[in-house]
């Protein structure tokens, strides 16, 4: 009888060991598969951002090398070049706007109209608007005057509006100041565009034949949808950060903007978020890349994660 009990006990111990081994083996296999999946997500995200960059770089370089100088041209002369701008934007869906700013403070921009509450609030465009022109020119007194023009998809003018309050000095912008040498293409870090609030980057190059800078705004929209589609389980989360640790996108959608004590609007960091689903990722963002990390939270939950980093346009980005 004792031998039978001993035999049964040994079987139970052996069964427990087998179950324990299988559990840990399956856990390692699952984690390994998950990490490989997210490596693919990081690669896809990096490729998406690279493609966005290349879609605008050629157009900026072409614009920077044109012989046309619109710095002192009246609006009517500038509008002769509208078909070029619109054709360029039509063939580059990721481009939100194409523009030139000049050393005398004048400015000419053509953008595709993407309906949003913010765009309607800022511009109140007429029905049927497909393209918008924002222009600042010098009048006869040497003062800068602003205008908004709204066109339909066939480039028929719907409305021209003089805007006395429109004051946009391109010389004060980061993209203008960094483009100091002709022949060099420069890129900003991702940020929210002042018009429309879209997430994107700006490419800029000093013009060769005019005293100014050519630039383009490139949208990075769709990154949040990409991260949402990449989730393996309902409780898995992904966040894309820039080199400053600010949230560019997450599987929970685009983050809201914050305003600091100086009145400067900025993207939030993980430390700024009050979303409990993203808080565990704040610890991951401080860990060495490509190292699996186990996080034991105060509420008893255990999270497994891994930070990944990749470079786009010479800047380090981090995806968790």
Model-derived regions: residue spans:
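Extracytoplasmic/periplasmic ligand-binding sensor regions of membrane-associated signaling proteins
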Residues: 137-221, 296
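Extracellular/periplasmic juxtamembrane segments that couple receptor/chemosensory ectodomains to their
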Residues: 198, 204-212, 216-218, 223, ...
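Short extracytoplasmic/periplasmic juxtamembrane "stem" segments immediately C-terminal to an N-terminal membrane anchor
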Residues: 32-51
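Extracellular/periplasmic ligand-binding regions of membrane signal-transduction receptors
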Residues: 43, 50-83, 99-117, 154-164, ...
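Solvent-exposed, extracytoplasmic
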Residues: 79-92, 178, 182, 192, ...
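Generic short beta-strand
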Residues: 98, 135, 148, 238-239, ...
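Extreme N-terminal signal-anchor transmembrane helix of membrane signaling/transducer proteins, especially
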Residues: 1-28, 32
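Alpha-helical transmembrane helix bundles of large polytopic membrane transport and channel proteins
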Residues: 97-158
């Amino acid at each position: 009888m004792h031998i039978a009990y001993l035999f049964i006990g040994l079987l139970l111990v052996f069964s427990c060991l087998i179950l324990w081994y299988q559990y840990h083996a399956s856990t390692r296999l699952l984690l390994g598969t998950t990490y490989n999946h997210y490596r693919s997500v990081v690669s896809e995200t990096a490729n998406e951002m690279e493609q966005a960059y290349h879609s605008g770089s050629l157009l900026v370089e072409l614009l920077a090398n044109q012989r046309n100088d619109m710095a002192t041209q009246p609006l009517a002369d500038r509008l002769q070049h509208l078909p070029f701008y619109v054709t360029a934007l039509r063939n580059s869906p990721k481009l939100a706007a194409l523009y030139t700013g000049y050393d005398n403070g004048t400015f000419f921009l053509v953008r595709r109209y993407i309906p949003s509450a913010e765009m309607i609030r800022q511009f109140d465009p007429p029905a049927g608007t497909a393209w918008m022109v924002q222009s600042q020119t010098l009048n006869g007194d040497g003062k800068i005057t602003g205008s908004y023009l709204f066109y339909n998809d066939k480039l028929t003018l719907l409305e021209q509006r003089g805007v006395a309050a429109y004051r946009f000095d391109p010389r004060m912008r980061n993209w203008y100041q960094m483009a100091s040498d002709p022949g060099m293409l420069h890129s900003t870090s991702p940020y929210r565009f002042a018009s429309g609030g879209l997430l994107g980057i700006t490419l800029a190059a000093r013009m060769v034949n005019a005293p100014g800078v050519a630039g383009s705004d490139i949208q990075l929209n769709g990154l949040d949808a990409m991260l949402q589609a990449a989730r393996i389980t309902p409780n898995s989360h992904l966040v894309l950060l820039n080199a400053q640790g600010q949230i560019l996108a997450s599987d929970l959608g685009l983050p809201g903007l914050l305003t600091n004590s100086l009145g400067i609007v900025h993207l939030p960091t993980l430390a700024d978020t009050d979303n409990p689903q993203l808080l565990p990722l704040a610890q991951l963002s401080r860990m060495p890349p490509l190292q699996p990390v186990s996080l034991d939270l105060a509420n008893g939950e255990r999270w497994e994660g891994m930070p990944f980093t990749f470079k786009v346009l010479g800047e380090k980005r981090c995806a968790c």
